[in-house]
Amino acid sequence: MLDKDLILNDNTCELSQISRHKTHVVEVGKVKIGGNNPVVVQSMALGVHIDADNIKSSAKHYAKEITELARTGSELVRIALNSEEVARAIPYIVEEINKEGFDGKILVGCGQYELDKLVQDYPDNIKMLGKIRINPGNIGFGDKRDEKFERVIEYAIMHDLPVRIGVNWGSLDKYLLQKLMDENSSLSNSRPSDVILRKALVMSALDSAKKAEEIGLNSNKIIISCKVSKVQDLILVYMALAKSSNYALHLGLTEAGMGNKGVVNTAAGLTYLLQNGIGDTIRASLTQRPGESRTNEVVVCQEILQSIGLRHFNPQVNSCPGCGRTSSDRFRILTEEVNGYIKTHMPMWKKKNPGVEHMNIAVMGCIVNGPGESKHANLGISLPGYGEKPVSAVYKNGKYFKTLQGDNVSEEFKAIIDNYVKKHYT
């Protein structure tokens, strides 16, 4: 039998009670990651081919995508440092995004095999970035690996750049993995290979971070990530990282997938970890459909954070899914129009009406749940369902406000929203 007092008094499900894992605070330009700072939304630019003979023009196109991501709400944008041309383009990219009102330090340079050479050949360009990312699995191999890793860390120290040590199971340090696999195979009770793989990921990240500190990089300049593609692996790896260190943690699947699959995988993994206080910055690594903007990965991250109450970005619209009681598409159309209205007006509201992002709006399709849901929102509207009178009841702050009817319900309700925002968020 259920304990009624436990149900009534237990506060463990209060979103405000999420206890964040204690991590070092890392400053990336004006953005603070870790500690009790808000979880930061990141994205990665797809990028463009940089024409060696027309660097400035190519940089302008690259900056356009970066600006679009930043304007959507990406607080940091990663770019691939994969060629000399990209390194040469950095000053022009920074110049272009500055023109649009964004700080060049939102840029995170992601280097792989070529990173060591690029920081040596273009030191003044790369120091314009806010952070660099090192993959311990492919910065170098054999005897060259430690040497190249050390040079990049020394460069970061010299220019006061934070570093994300980003381990990826698709490019994991093969020597470390082989060593652990050999050790495991010699045991009488050997563990499954996926357990060893997760262990290798965590060890690679923590050993690399420790090595960076030994070289002289402060712990408040280090962020760690361990990217995998399976949700359960992601959860287990990050729980181990959180248990073993206080480095700031970047969350994300390495390849989440396309469409609903990618969104669901990302939400499932990140929500569990964030709800348990793990994670200081996040990215949704979604495969976009051809021609589709990458801004969707920013929106997904924002929706995840807002859904669990960690951050608020836009007014929340709760809407009816529809059923046999709903008699038309009016509630669907109104929901779409309200969402569009919010999207159009948020840039202005953010400047003039602070706190509007906490607003809740309900758009319901019949009398069964319509009034009740509407009363839980700041503003709610209950449209008529099958067999109901052709009127729409509007509720404000939990109380009946007025009834709308006729052909202008949408415009009248949007006007009510606008008036509410102006009156309550100043």
Swiss-Prot record:
NCBIfam families: ispG_gcpE, PRK00366.1. Its cofactor is [4Fe-4S] cluster. This is 4-hydroxy-3-methylbut-2-en-1-yl diphosphate synthase (flavodoxin). GO terms for molecular function: 4 iron, 4 sulfur cluster binding; 4-hydroxy-3-methylbut-2-en-1-yl diphosphate synthase activity (ferredoxin); 4-hydroxy-3-methylbut-2-enyl-diphosphate synthase activity (flavodoxin); iron ion binding. One of its GO terms (biological process) is terpenoid biosynthetic process. It is an enzyme of class 1 (oxidoreductase). Its EC number is 1.17.7.3. Gene3D superfamilies: Dihydropteroate synthase-like, Sulfite Reductase Hemoprotein, domain 1. Keywords: 4Fe-4S, Iron, Iron-sulfur, Isoprene biosynthesis, Metal-binding, Oxidoreductase. Converts 2C-methyl-D-erythritol 2,4-cyclodiphosphate (ME-2,4cPP) into 1-hydroxy-2-methyl-2-(E)-butenyl 4-diphosphate. Pathway: Isoprenoid biosynthesis; isopentenyl diphosphate biosynthesis via DXP pathway; isopentenyl diphosphate from 1-deoxy-D-xylulose 5-phosphate: step 5/6. It catalyses: (2E)-4-hydroxy-3-methylbut-2-enyl diphosphate + oxidized [flavodoxin] + H2O + 2 H(+) = 2-C-methyl-D-erythritol 2,4-cyclic diphosphate + reduced [flavodoxin]. Binds 1 [4Fe-4S] cluster. The keyword 4Fe-4S applies. InterPro entries: Dihydropteroate_synth-like_sf (IPR011005), IspG_bac (IPR016425), IspG_bac-typ (IPR004588), NO2/SO3_Rdtase_4Fe4S_sf (IPR045854). It comes from Wolbachia pipientis wMel. Belongs to the IspG family. Pfam families: GcpE (PF04551). [4Fe-4S] cluster binds at C320, C323, C366, E373.
